[in-house]
């Protein structure tokens, strides 16, 4: 047996080795490659189908196999692979070959296809070589048709798995060859069938013409198929010839920009000099400086324009010739390159990202994934987020300076060196850290121990430092962009220069190194240049060369000035290869004289696209702007596709100097006059008419507005359009004024236009023209008018409505309702009359709702039909011209031919009928009819003015006061009887059939019939005739009554006689029947049986069988049978009666005996069985009859019961939810009573009133008790043993639990330590019993856990905890103009969101309160769809498993180091009870977030924004803190009491807090940003999220008390001035500045302060009183806001221009934080749109009174929309709800700047550090990072400032931030021991540490982790590589596939918990830190 098993095992092993061998795998993949069929197979099949001869078949097969062999070889041979794989090279080769191939084929058919067979194999035949070449080349093209190219790529992918690549390629080729032979064999069998059929046909054999024709047709079919396939594939390739030539930004534009910058710079310098003159009085020196600056700028501009470099000893002409030759060569080379392929064009279908602050778009190079090697942990690793520009730079350096590079050391040596270096650094930092702790333990002062950072001090005595923004010794987020300053430099007195000064010469070497072909040649030229300049250069190139220069010649000075903006670079690091590459040359500092020279700004040039693109719709506006700027420029190049839209001119102003505002004012005045003149006729007499007109605006304008364009649809678009119109008219007005001055009375036209968009779906918009459409994101469209694009991957998930769909629930409802309606009339005796009436009313209401719904659907359907018709006309070529011509023709025919002819015919007919003619009335009405020309959307123009380009854009003709022919006219005296409420639409539109329709493209309406009034008149006449004959009819009726009475008596007598005869006949009939029924045997015993018959046959039922009259003498057989049947029937009825009687006495049983079967005989035993059978048949018939009779009532009752049960279920469901909601609300309110006993009871015992939503896990209590019994032992879970496959498997199986206790994990996006102990135990047991965690390895040491302590910190904090100021610094890019929707979580983390009464309650509240608050997250109104909920649950499941997979550690006695399911039973939550002081960044981002979507704070939708300075805001007066606006705690700081209740008046609190003068005794403190210096009390966590209605809880708690805007004078200073001072306008200031006054809104209290704009002069005075804290550099930026971007405003070319930088920065600030808009309801929008249409017509009329009155009467123009009262103040507009002031909700976008800033911590020293204010927090500048609000949200409880040991909360903060980060990083790496846990003894194993001072410091208290003042927090933040990769695999929501092909990382959730410090690290000597820039 053993031998057999061993042999079997060997055979199995041998088989496995054979299968896994290179040869077998190659054969397998090669065989799969056969099924990738390309167009080359068509050529091969053509030779076989056409039977052209064996030579061609052999040549085609040989070429095909050879081409495939070359393709296989190319996978191994790189040069061949590059030649065949590069698309551009292949395209260049393919296009000429295809053209020649098809041209040669079509022109040489006869010579090419020679069907005569050749007898010799070696006779030269061109067709054979041609076939060979075709098959060979087409096989190399390597494009595939079926199924795809994936099977072919498998060979390339699998080849890298094996070392023996040649063997793999060879075997794969043979595998393909085998598959190819089999495939050809099968195809040959199929193709042989048609040839056999043709050979069997005698006609084909005899007729050679048919054979040749068939061959030609087959050849053409193959060629056409091949041509189509090739064209399709060419569309997928970048064509180098047919490309969109984009316009390059010209040098003249750049020159103009530099001139503008220079002019702005000179103006700024002159303004600064004026200020200095006023202060210092140094007039002469400053004037000379300004003149000198202007001269220098002119010289710089001259040098920039010429761009000539000429040195000493060389003439200018020589350099000119050389430069021209170089430019010619470069131009030729560039033209050749761009002719074939422009590498700077948009090849991929990317969106054009445009920034308003710059001219061209920024190239977002970091968004795409890029692979490059970099040093990590001392080893070369592949980084997939490496910057492409940096890799290109290193490649250039390597090529140019390869001789200077150091020798490459082995990887092991590099790793050893890195390990040793990092160990030394770690030890040094550790020793320094321990020494500082020991110094603290010995009693040293904190200031002497804390590591300090140098600051640049402005005043040494007062210790005033420069602002962080300008401090050169600081780096990080406080370092902004500095503008060009002026520094005093050294000048040589002996220099006799006309310009009076010299500059320091900086000669850059790196520029020539990178862009020269030979470095040695550059060295020689450089030395020669230095010699010409008289400079002694250093020979080493490593050290700086600072050599004296005696005197500069004038040529040398010019040469120095000609060098443009060289920058100084320095490469830092351990390798000194590129260190100090630049040799600097300085002037001689012997003779010193002060002069003002500009400092070159060191910038990083942002990579931008070369082209500046414009969209099609922006062309008009930009064209006008360019005409203003430069008449020579023209931007005919539209590089961006925009939505299909047409510009429609609606008004043209030809008058000189008029504008749209004056015109509209005249219209409004005209309307005022109209209203005044028509008050008596309209307002008084037709009040109801006007009210109904206004009420029915929606009905009359629904269909009109739907055909309008998108801009007229929405109010925002209307506002935007109006803004553009005002801009256009303003620009034209300025042009007109200029032309009037210059050219006299030269009139120009001002056009007012709208843009009409197409309703058809267009997914090409915003794409760049010329980009490769095949590589764009794939979309699926299945409808003609589709609103959204869908990916093919998710197409199956879309709910597509089938063709035949039935609403089952609706049908059931109708059926049940019908049953109930049938039943309701029968329930007349019911006592519930009231309920029946209610039910009837309810049914009627439902019926009305259904009718309304049907009407809405019908209107929507008609609207869609109109849109489809309009789009069809718009898309068909020349359709608009044809339609417009037809409409104009019909209009002319109707107006001047048809209607006058009808009038003439009518009046002639009246005269023939002897009626008076109505010529005047008819022609008067005919003259009132107006045919107004309208745009395609219905915007009215005039009768004579046609729309611009109406033949191409379309036209509508609107008929006002349409004429209808009437047989006669009523007199005007009877008009008052007319019902005024019946409004008649006195307008219509003309159709192409000459008919009238109410809406464009609508259905024709019914016209009044001409003879209808005549018909009505005849009916009235008939009625009159009937009335006259009424009396005659009454007389006749009275006379007829007597006759009728006599007739009735006679009829009654006849009826009585007939009845008597009928009775007699019945008696005779019954006598014969009874006699025949009796039995003949009865005659024998008459006495006895007579008695029995009387008893048994009392009731003789009629027989159902018809009895025919019979002959008494002759009895036939049929008559006998009839008699027998009658006898049996009577017997059956007797038996039924007897059974009924017996049943009453006793129940019927199957053993019934002795029943009389016959009426004549008694008990007959021979008939006993028969009697039983008859009895059961009778009973069976009886039951069926009973069922049949009661079936109807049974079904009704059954259906009633079902219907009632359904209703009961529905009501129960509602009751459950309502009860659940009430219980949750009750618990929420009870949560603030601070009763620990109730909380404990609620925690440990389930609530019986709450209905559980999932089944309870079996024996949950036993598991809980078992675990709780062993509560002292820590619980761990090893998640590192999970494999990737197991993770995905569990992702599929993991279901989101709905149990109310576990909802806080899945639905409440919060941290794990707030989960109750019972929940943790439950999940721990649940997951262990389900086998998710490996219980065997839970106590083992974890691999790689030594460097992953940071993960425990991550899981213990909420990941969006960022300050508002922090987020405001991120500044997302301006080009994101769309709403960026993110699912955000309601804020529960604000420092002021909760309070505590006592410190001891902090732990309990943190452990228990969150189980009741926000457990079940109800989706908002935007998220109610099941698919949305499903997606949210999926994301929660991903996040939950991701956290479980990331966060694991084996650390004792620390909740943050424990398992995510571990229960901390002793309440030792060290990381959460530690009080953290609030810093400048402590306000969380979550205060502005909600369960809704956030919008981009940088979007600019052309809305009007609020001015910053009108807000009267002082955050120091924040006395009362409202923690919630609906239900929450109300805190009074004076009394320190907490109230619980509902603050209803806070629900609609103002968005801007008006200053309240409340007299309080507050001590002075520094500037309180957002209320950070306010006193924090012990308060509970205010987490007021109802379970079902979260949208009713506003999340503007902090904003209502402290808005996110502050006065400008408080942003940059610590303000010590008057706290209650308001910002106002001084009436005594200069009046030349523009000021805007805003009236006071009506707010709470009787305040009389107004929201006014502060004056800039007052602002400057207030700043002067505060003290001059900064130098002149600071004074130049007085009014810059806190979020100043620092970018140059003049770069915003063709954009919104500001008068000053202050306005630009203010505009940027307002766009970030505020959005101010007009909110109009939908009916208001429609009414406004209708009014606009009427206004367009009234503008063109000389006397618009009649049209205006008729428009008002018909409801086409509404008075309530006109806002005639133009004196509305701001409070009234706010009160009406028209004007809204709202904060823009901050989005959670991040960019590269934020990632860099989050890695840097700033340490500041300030004198206020030593101050202590009682009752307030201390202001600290040691490190603002750790004073964050993430812990304060759990209860920042410091009230008393006596305790000064807050500096020791984190001992590592003794070090500087840079050393602190370095210490953390170095301590987390396990250099050699990767498999074991080797923790840092200082941090993790305090018992073994050698530092006694640290031991004493840590072990002062047993409850160290729970002590607020002594808590130690270890904060690690490094992302390891493997965890990021796992995260990418597990949660695809965090990643994105960009542009359809590449994989780029986006939306990485940043775990930002401690202020500026985040999850990334910037450490120069380590490259493990990841820098990621989110692309979206």
Swiss-Prot record:
Its topology with respect to the membrane? Multi-pass membrane protein
Source species, please?
Nymphaea alba (White water-lily)
Biased region (Basic and acidic residues) positions are 836-861, 1633-1665
**Comp. bias (Acidic residues):** 619-635
> Which coarse location class describes where this protein primarily resides?
plastid
Q: Which GO terms describe its cellular component?
A: chloroplast inner membrane
Q: Where in the cell is it found?
A: Plastid, Chloroplast inner membrane
- By its UniProt entry, which PANTHER family does this protein fall under? PROTEIN TIC 214, PROTEIN TIC 214-RELATED
Q: What is this protein called?
A: Protein TIC 214
């Amino acid at each position: 047996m053993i031998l057999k098993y061993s042999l079997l095992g060997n055979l199995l092993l041998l088989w496995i080795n054979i299968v896994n061998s290179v040869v077998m795998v190659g054969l397998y993949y090669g065989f799969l490659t056969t099924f990738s069929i390309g167009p080359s197979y068509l050529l091969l099949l053509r030779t076989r189908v056409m039977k052209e001869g064996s030579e061609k078949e052999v040549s085609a097969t040989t070429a095909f196999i050879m081409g495939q062999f070359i393709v296989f070889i190319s996978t191994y041979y790189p040069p061949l692979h590059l030649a065949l794989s590069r698309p551009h090279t292949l395209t260049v080769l393919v296009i000429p070959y295809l053209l020649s191939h098809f041209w040669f084929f079509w022109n040489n058919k006869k010579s090419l296809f020679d069907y005569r067979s050749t007898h010799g194999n070696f006779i030269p035949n061109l067709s054979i070589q041609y076939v060979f070449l075709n098959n060979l080349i087409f096989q190399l093209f390597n494009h595939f048709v079926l199924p795809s190219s994936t099977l072919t790529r498998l060979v390339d992918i699998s080849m890298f798995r094996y070392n023996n690549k040649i063997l793999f390629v060879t075997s794969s080729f043979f595998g393909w060859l085998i598959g190819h032979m089999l495939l050809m064999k099968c195809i040959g069998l199929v193709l042989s069938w048609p040839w056999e059929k043709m050979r069997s046909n005698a006609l084909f054999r005899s007729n050679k013409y048919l054979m040749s024709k068939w061959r030609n047709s087959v050849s053409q079919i193959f060629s056409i198929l091949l041509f189509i396939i090739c064209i399709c594939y060419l569309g997928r390739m970048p064509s180098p010839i047919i490309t969109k030539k984009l316009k390059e930004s010209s040098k003249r534009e750049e020159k103009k920009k530099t001139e503008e910058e220079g002019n702005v710079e000179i103006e700024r310098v002159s303004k600064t000099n004026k200020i200095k003159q006023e202060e210092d009085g140094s007039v002469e020196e400053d004037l000379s400086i300004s003149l000198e600056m202007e001269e220098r700028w002119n010289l710089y501009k001259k040098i920039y324009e010429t761009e000539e470099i000429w040195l000493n000893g060389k003439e200018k002409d020589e350099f000119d010739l050389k430069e021209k030759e170089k430019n010619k060569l470069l131009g030729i080379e560039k033209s050749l390159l761009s002719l074939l392929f422009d590498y700077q064009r948009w090849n991929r279908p990317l969106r054009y990202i445009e920034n308003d602050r710059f001219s061209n778009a920024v190239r977002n190079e970091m968004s795409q994934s890029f692979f490059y090697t970099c040093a990590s942990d001392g080893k070369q690793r592949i980084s997939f987020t490496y910057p492409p520009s940096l890799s290109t730079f290193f490649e250039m350096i390597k090529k140019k300076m390869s001789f200077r590079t150091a020798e490459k050391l082995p990887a092991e040596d590099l790793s050893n060196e890195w390990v040793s270096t990092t160990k030394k650094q770690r030890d040094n930092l550790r020793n320094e850290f321990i020494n500082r702790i020991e110094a603290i333990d010995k009693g040293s002062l904190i200031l002497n121990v804390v590591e300090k950072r140098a600051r640049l001090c402005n005043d040494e005595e007062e210790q005033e430092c420069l602002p962080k923004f300008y401090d050169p010794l600081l780096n990080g987020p406080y370092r902004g962009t500095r503008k060009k300053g002026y520094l005093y430099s050294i000048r040589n007195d002996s220099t006799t220069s006309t310009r009076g000064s010299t500059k320091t010469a900086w000669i850059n070497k790196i520029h020539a190194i990178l862009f020269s072909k030979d470095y040695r040649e550059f060295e020689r030229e450089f030395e020669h240049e230095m010699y010409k300049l008289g400079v002694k250069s250093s020979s080493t190139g490593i050290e700086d060369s600072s050599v004296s220069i005696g005197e500069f010649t004038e040529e040398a000075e010019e040469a120095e000035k000609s060098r443009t903006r060289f920058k100084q670079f320095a490469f830092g690091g351990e390798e000194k290869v590129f260190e100090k590459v630049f040799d600097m040359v300085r002037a001689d500092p012997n003779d010193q004289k002060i002069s003002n020279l500009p400092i070159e700004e060191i910038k990083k040039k942002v990579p931008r696209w070369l082209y500046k693109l414009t969209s099609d719709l922006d062309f008009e506006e930009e064209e006008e702007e360019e005409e203003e700027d430069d008449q020579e420029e023209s931007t005919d190049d539209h590089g961006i596709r925009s939505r299909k839209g047409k510009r429609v001119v609606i008004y043209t102003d030809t008058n000189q100097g008029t504008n749209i505002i004056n015109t509209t004012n005249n219209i409004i005045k005209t309307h005022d006059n109209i209203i005044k003149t028509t008050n008596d006729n309209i307002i008084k007499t037709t009040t109801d008419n006007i009210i109904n007109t206004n009420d029915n605006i929606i009905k009359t304008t629904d269909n009109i507005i739907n055909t309008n364009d998108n801009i007229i649809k929405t109010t925002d678009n209307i506002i935007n359009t109006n803004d553009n119109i005002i801009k256009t008219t303003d620009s034209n007005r300025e042009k007109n004024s200029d032309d009037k001055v210059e050219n006299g009375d030269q009139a120009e036209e001002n056009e007012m236009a709208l843009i009409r968009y197409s309703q058809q779906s267009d997914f090409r918009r915003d794409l760049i023209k010329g980009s490769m459409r095949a590589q764009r994101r794939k979309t699926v469209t299945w409808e003609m008018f589709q609103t959204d694009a869908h990916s093919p991957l998710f197409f199956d998930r879309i709910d597509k409505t089938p063709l035949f769909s039935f609403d089952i629930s609706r049908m059931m409802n109708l059926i049940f309702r019908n049953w109930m309606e049938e039943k309701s009339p029968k329930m007349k005796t019911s006592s519930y009359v009231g309920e029946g009436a209610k039910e009837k009313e309810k049914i009627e209401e439902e019926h009305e709702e259904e009718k309304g719904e049907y009407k809405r659907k019908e209107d929507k359907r008609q609207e869609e039909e109109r849109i489809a018709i309009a789009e069809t006309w718009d898309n068909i070529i020349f359709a608009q011209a044809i339609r417009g011509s037809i409409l104009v023709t019909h209009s002319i025919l109707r107006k001047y031919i048809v209607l006058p002819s009808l009038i003439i015919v009518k009046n002639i007919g009246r005269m023939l009928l002897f009626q008076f003619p109505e010529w005047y009335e008819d022609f008067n009405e005919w003259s009132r009819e107006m045919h107004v020309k309208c745009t395609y959307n219905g915007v009215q123009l005039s009768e004579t003015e046609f729309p611009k380009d109406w033949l191409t854009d379309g036209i509508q003709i609107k008929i006002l006061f349409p004429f209808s022919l009437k047989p006669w006219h009523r007199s005007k005296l009877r008009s008052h009887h007319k019902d005024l409420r019946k409004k008649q639409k006195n307008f219509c539109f003309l159709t192409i059939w000459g008919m009238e329709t109410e809406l464009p493209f609508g259905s024709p309406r019914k016209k009044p019939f001409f003879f209808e009034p005549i018909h009505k008149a005849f009916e009235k006449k008939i009625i009159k005739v009937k009335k006259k004959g009424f009396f005659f009819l009454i007389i006749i009726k009275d006379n007829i009554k007597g006759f009728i009475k006599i007739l009735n008596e006679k009829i009654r007598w006849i009826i009585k006689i007939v009845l008597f005869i009928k009775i007699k006949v019945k008696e005779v009939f019954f006598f014969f029947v009874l006699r025949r029924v009796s039995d003949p045997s009865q005659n024998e015993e008459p006495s006895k049986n007579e008695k029995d018959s009387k008893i048994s046959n009392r009731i003789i039922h009629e027989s159902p069988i018809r009895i025919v009259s019979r002959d008494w003498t002759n009895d036939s057989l049929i008559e006998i049978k009839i008699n027998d049947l009658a006898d049996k029937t009577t017997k059956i009825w007797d038996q039924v009666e007897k059974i009924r009687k017996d049943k009453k006495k006793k129940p019927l049983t199957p053993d019934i005996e002795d029943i009389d079967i016959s009426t004549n005989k008694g008990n007959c035993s021979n008939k006993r069985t028969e009697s039983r059978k008859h009895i059961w048949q009778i009973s069976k018939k009886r039951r069926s009859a009973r069922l049949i009779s009661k079936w109807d009532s049974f079904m009704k009752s059954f259906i009633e019961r079902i219907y009632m049960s359904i209703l009961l279920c529905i009501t129960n469901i509602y009751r459950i939810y309502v009860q659940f909601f009430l219980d949750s609300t009750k618990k929420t309110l009870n949560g603030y009573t601070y009763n620990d006993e109730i909380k404990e009871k609620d925690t440990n015992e389930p609530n019986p009133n709450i209905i559980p939503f999932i089944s309870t896990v079996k024996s949950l209590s036993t598991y809980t008790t078992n675990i709780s019994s062993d509560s002292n032992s820590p619980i761990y879970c090893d998640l590192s043993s999970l494999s990737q496959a197991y993770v995905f498997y569990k992702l599929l199986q993991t279901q989101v639990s709905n149990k109310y206790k576990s909802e806080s994990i899945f639905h409440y996006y919060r941290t794990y330590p707030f989960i109750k102990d019972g929940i943790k135990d439950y999940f721990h047991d649940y997951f262990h019993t389900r086998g998710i965690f490996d219980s065997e390895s839970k106590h083992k040491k974890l691999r790689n856990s030594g460097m992953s302590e940071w993960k425990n910190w991550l899981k213990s904090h909420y990941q969006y905890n960022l300050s508002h100021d922090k987020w405001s610094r991120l500044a997302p890019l301006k080009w994101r103009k769309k709403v960026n929707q993110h699912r955000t979580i309601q804020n529960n983390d604000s420092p002021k969101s909760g309070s505590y009464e006592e410190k001891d309650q902090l732990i309990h509240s943190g452990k228990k309160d969150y189980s009741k608050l926000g457990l079940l997250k109800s989706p908002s109104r935007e998220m109610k769809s099941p698919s949305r909920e499903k997606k949210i649950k999926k994301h929660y499941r991903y996040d939950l498993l991701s956290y479980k997979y990331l966060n694991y550690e084996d650390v004792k006695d620390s909740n943050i180091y424990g398992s995510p399911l571990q229960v901390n039973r002793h309440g030792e939550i060290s990381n959460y009870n530690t009080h953290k002081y609030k810093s400048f960044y402590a306000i969380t981002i979550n205060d502005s977030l909600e369960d809704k979507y956030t919008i981009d704070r940088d979007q600019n939708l052309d809305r009007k924004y609020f001015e910053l300075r009108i807000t009267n805001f002082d955050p120091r007066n924040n006395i009362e803190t409202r923690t919630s606006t609906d239900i929450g705690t109300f805190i009074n700081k004076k009394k320190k009491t907490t109230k619980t209740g509902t603050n209803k008046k806070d629900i609609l609190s103002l968005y801007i807090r008006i200053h309240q003068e409340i007299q309080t005794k507050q001590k002075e403190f520094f500037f309180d940003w957002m209320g950070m210096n306010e006193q924090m009390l012990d308060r509970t966590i205010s987490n007021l999220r109802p379970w079902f209605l979260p949208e009713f809880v506003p999340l503007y708690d902090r904003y209502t008390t402290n808005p996110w805007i502050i006065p400008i004078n408080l942003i940059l200073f610590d303000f010590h001035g008057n706290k209650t001072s308001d910002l106002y306008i001084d009436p005594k200031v200069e009046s030349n500045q523009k000021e805007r006054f805003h009236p006071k809104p009506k707010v709470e209290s009787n305040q009389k302060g107004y929201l006014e704009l502060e004056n800039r002069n007052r602002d400057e005075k207030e700043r002067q009183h505060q003290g001059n804290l900064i130098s002149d550099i600071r004074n130049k930026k007085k009014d810059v806001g806190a979020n100043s971007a620092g970018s140059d405003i003049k770069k915003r070319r063709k954009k919104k221009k500001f008068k000053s930088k202050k306005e630009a920065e203010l505009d940027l600030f307002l766009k970030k934080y505020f959005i101010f808009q007009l909110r109009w309801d939908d009916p208001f929008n429609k009414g406004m749109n209708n009014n606009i249409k009427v206004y367009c017509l009234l503008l063109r009329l000389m006397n618009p009174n009649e049209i205006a009155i008729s428009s008002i009467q018909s409801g086409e123009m509404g008075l309530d929309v006109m806002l005639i009262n133009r004196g509305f103040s701001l409070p009234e507009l706010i009160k009406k709800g028209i004007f809204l002031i709202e904060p823009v909700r901050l989005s959670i976008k991040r960019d590269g700047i934020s990632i860099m800033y989050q890695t840097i911590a700033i340490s500041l020293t300030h004198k206020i550090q030593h101050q202590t204010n009682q009752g307030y927090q201390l202001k600290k500048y040691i490190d603002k990072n750790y004073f964050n609000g993430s812990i304060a949200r759990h209860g920042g409880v410091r009230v008393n400032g006596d305790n000064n040991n807050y500096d020791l909360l984190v001992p590592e903060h003794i070090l500087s931030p840079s050393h602190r980060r370095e210490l953390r990083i170095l301590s987390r790496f396990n250099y050699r021991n990767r498999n074991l846990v080797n923790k840092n003894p200082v941090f993790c194993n305090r018992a073994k540490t050698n530092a006694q001072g640290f031991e004493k410091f840590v072990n002062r208290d047993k409850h160290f982790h729970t002590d607020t003042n002594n808590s130690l927090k270890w904060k690690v933040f490094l992302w390891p590589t493997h965890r990021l990769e796992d995260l990418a695999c597990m949660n695809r929501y965090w990643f994105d596939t960009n542009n359809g092909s590449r994989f780029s990382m986006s939306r990485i959730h940043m775990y930002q918990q401690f202020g500026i410090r985040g999850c990334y690290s910037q450490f120069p000597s380590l490259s493990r830190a990841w820098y990621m820039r989110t692309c979206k």
